[in-house]
């Protein structure tokens, strides 16, 4: 397991924000709850936008994998053209494949780009913007042990 610090996150988010701004110029930031919320907020600051929304995606309840990915609280994105979908990591990619498919089904006129800090080679989907590849389990600085 690897701990991913706040300082690393800020440095990586700045790199990604510059790349996203220069190559895509999104109108909207869409964070996937919960892992993508901290990053979505950082991107909203760096890209100077208040159009920062979230949706929920659940693939596990506790340690039990659900038969289907639950996706809910999807904001209305029909009036926009370019949206980044932000999460902390793509692991197996199953959840993100479902999220991206649902968004494209609902908003076919919108161009979606996936942004993560980490992804794994075994993932079913590769992010459009990413700074780190890993095979390790990542413990993010925003994951609190209560």
Region roles according to the model:
Residues 1-146:
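PRPP-associated nucleotide enzymes
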